[in-house]
Amino acid sequence: DAGIPLLLRRPDSEFSLANFMRAQIYAAFATLALGLDILKQENVALDILLGHGGIFKTPGVAQRYLAAAAGVPVTCLETAGEGGPYGMALLAAYRLHRRDGETLADYLQTRVFAGAAGETVTPSPADKAGFAAFLAQYKTALQAERALM
């Protein structure tokens, strides 16, 4: 039940603050990418993701890396920096106010975020390749982490 912080790097890699922070954000999205791989195997496809929560407070950064991890465009609205309680409140409002046959996606698109300003980032081939390389190393490093537990 105790966490073990683990930072691994290759001897030939450059240890810099930028690379360290990128690794932190990539790691935050690595488990999501693994889950999305399972969904792909089940023939579930994503068209776009909406980024919401504290990780998106700084515009563009986590959004760009999430787009690379998911392989789909990511839109962040003006309210993207609001976190979990905001999302829970939206789910509660949906349960209370939804119309017959109205999906959560429809409710959010037409009644909550209609007219909200946002930015969409499409994953670049270079970012996708960079994340794929990270994810391959991440999967390998999971064995080392398991050995420590």
Task: Report each predicted region and the residues it spans.
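Glycine/Thr-rich phosphate-binding loops that ligate phosphate moieties of nucleotide
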Residues: 1-149
